[in-house]
Structure formats: C-alpha cells, structure tokens
C-alpha cells in the first residue's frame, strides 16, 4: 500500500493557518487602535500601548508568511487576486505603516505633537482593519477571471457586501482589543473595557448573522455547500458551536473573568474562519480557480516546504515565549517605553 500527500493541500493549510494566526494576533492590537478614541486620558493610552509593545512587531510576521506563501505556492491565485484587490491592499499597507510609525514616534514626541501620532495610530488601525475586511468580502463575492487573468474592473471590489465585511472585521478586531484590555489591565480602565466588550459582542454577533445570511446569496455554490444533504450534517456544528461559545462569552463577561473573554473571542474568530473555509474549499479564487489549478510545480512546493517546516515551529516557539515572558497585568507607570 502506498501513502501519498497532496502537497497543494498542505500548502493551502499552511497559508490558511498563517493568515488566521495573523488575524487573531494582529487583530487585537489593531483593535486597540480602533478603540483608542474611547480612552482620551494619556495614562490610559500609555497602558494600552505598553500592553502590546513587547509583542506587536512580531505579529506581522504571519502576514508576510501568508502573502509570501501565496505568491510562491499558488502564483496563479496571487497573479489574479492582487490586481483585483490593488486598492484595499495598498490601503491596508498604508494603514499598517501609519500605525507602526505612530506607535514608535508617539513615545518620542512632546505633548503638542503626541495627539497627532495618536490620531495616526487610531486612523491607521481603522484603515488597515477596514481594508482587510473589504478584501475578504471582495474575494468571497467572486473575482472575474478570463484565460487565467483578472478581467474585472478597478472598482469591482467595492460593493455593499464588501463594505459589510469590512465593518464586521473592524467590530471583531475592536472586540478582540477590548477583551485584551480586560486580560491585561486593572482598575477603571479594565471596567471600561468590560462595558465596551458588551456592546461590541452584540455588534459582532449581529455582523456574523448578517454576513452569514448574505453569503449564500452570493453564489449557488455557497448555498449548496451549507444547506444540501448530506453537507448539512457537517456544516451544522459550526453555528451550534458559535451559539455555545456566545453563551460562555456572555457568562464570562457577566462574571467579570479575566482571561476567558479574550480566549472565547478567539474561539468566535476561529469558528468564523472555519465557516469561511467551508464556503470556499476547494477554491482559492472562489468559483474560478481551485488550489490545484493555482499551484506551482510540485517540486517547487516540496522545496519550499522543507524550509517552512523548520521556520513555522521556530516562529511559534519564539512567539509563545514572548507572550509568556510578558504575561500578567500592565499597570500605570510600568512598561517597555
């Protein structure tokens, strides 16, 4: 008996994993930027930024791995998606640059200019999060492909559905940021994070519901994947799990737990991501290009897999160590800047 591994599927999983880790790890510090206007006091803002200062730089590593892996392992998908998403991708990069520069320069300025960097930090976070969500919606609604090339227009990405997914991701990141503050802060700042988390949770549940209802109407493939027999046996556990996690998250907020709200919010993101995977598989460009059609030669994928097999455990190990070293509450007057 022979045993074979589908290298294209392995690479699809690696890229999906890298993107998910980026979303949850960079999501909460983008969420902190989104929430920044709600915390006008300098002392609170210092605590907020110090809570992520030791780890935020490494979060973009996963975005580079996901984007680089897509270009190397699935060059056809990369060649189609990037022209289709030029505007939101460029907007995302501009937002990340503004946020990164503001994060560092805020600590090196006088009071008169600090507010400008605070605005840049919040604005960059909003722009990056919104652009990521819009790009996701644009991919889900489908990309016009003819002869292995993008054949759509410059503004095809901008639709009511993509705006909906963009705002939904902003809300989700904000909830991640609020529950991160619950985990990492104390006193009045923590209490305000609790109350903010309640509003954001209900907003996120509404967003999940609206996106989930709208998605099957984008393409008949999505409806068949979720609602036809016997697929429904495999897809039903996802909304059931969302309901269970929601109840647990509500209870954890009501009981004012420290860690549970953050990790249960991560679980909501994981379930939403699983739903996205169910909808898209086996397409990497929905309804146009499958992962096997987009794959680079198997020899190239195997060559790259050797390097990635050692790189990912190294990044995971370093990331885990960094979070472990800098665990615990962040208090006013303490920090890394």
Where are these regions (language model features)?
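Long, contiguous internal "core" modules enriched in hydrophobic/ aromatic residues
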Residues: 105-257
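Alpha-helical transmembrane segments
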Residues: 11-22, 82-94, 122-126, 156-170, ...
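Helix-coil boundary and interhelical linker segments in multi-pass alpha-helical membrane proteins
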Residues: 1-13, 71-86, 140-160
């Amino acid at each position: 008996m022979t045993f074979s591994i589908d290298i294209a599927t392995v690479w699809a999983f690696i890229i999906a994993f890298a993107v998910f880790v980026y979303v949850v790890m960079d999501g909460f510090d983008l969420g902190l930027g989104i929430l920044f206007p709600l915390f006008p006091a300098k002392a609170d803002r210092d605590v907020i930024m110090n809570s992520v200062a030791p780890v935020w730089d490494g979060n973009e590593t996963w975005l580079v791995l996901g984007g680089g892996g897509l270009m190397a392992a699935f060059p056809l998908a990369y060649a189609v998606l990037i022209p289709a998403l030029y505007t939101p991708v460029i907007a995302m990069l501009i937002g990340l640059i503004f946020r990164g520069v503001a994060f560092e320069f805020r600590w090196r300025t006088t009071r008169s200019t600090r507010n400008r960097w605070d605005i840049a930090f919040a604005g960059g976070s909003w722009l990056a999060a919104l652009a990521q969500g819009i790009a996701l919606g644009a991919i889900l609604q489908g990309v016009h492909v003819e002869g292995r090339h993008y054949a759509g227009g410059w503004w095809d990405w901008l639709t009511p559905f993509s705006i909906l997914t963009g705002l939904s991701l902003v809300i989700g990141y904000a909830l991640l940021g609020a529950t991160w503050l619950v985990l990492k802060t104390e006193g009045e700042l923590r209490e305000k994070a609790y109350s903010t988390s309640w509003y954001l949770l209900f907003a996120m549940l509404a967003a999940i519901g609206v996106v989930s209802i709208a998605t099957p109407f984008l393409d008949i493939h999505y409806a068949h994947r979720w609602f036809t027999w016997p697929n429904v046996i495999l897809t039903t556990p996802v909304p059931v799990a969302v309901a269970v996690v929601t109840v647990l998250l509500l209870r954890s907020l009501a009981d004012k737990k420290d860690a549970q709200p953050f990790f249960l919010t991560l679980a909501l993101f994981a379930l939403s991501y699983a739903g996205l995977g169910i909808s898209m598989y086996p397409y990497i460009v929905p309804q146009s290009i499958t992962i096997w059609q987009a794959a680079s030669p198997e020899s190239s994928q195997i060559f790259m897999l050797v390097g990635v097999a050692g790189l990912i455990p190294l990044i995971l190990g370093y990331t885990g160590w960094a979070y472990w070293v800098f665990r615990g509450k962040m208090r006013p007057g303490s920090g890394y800047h």
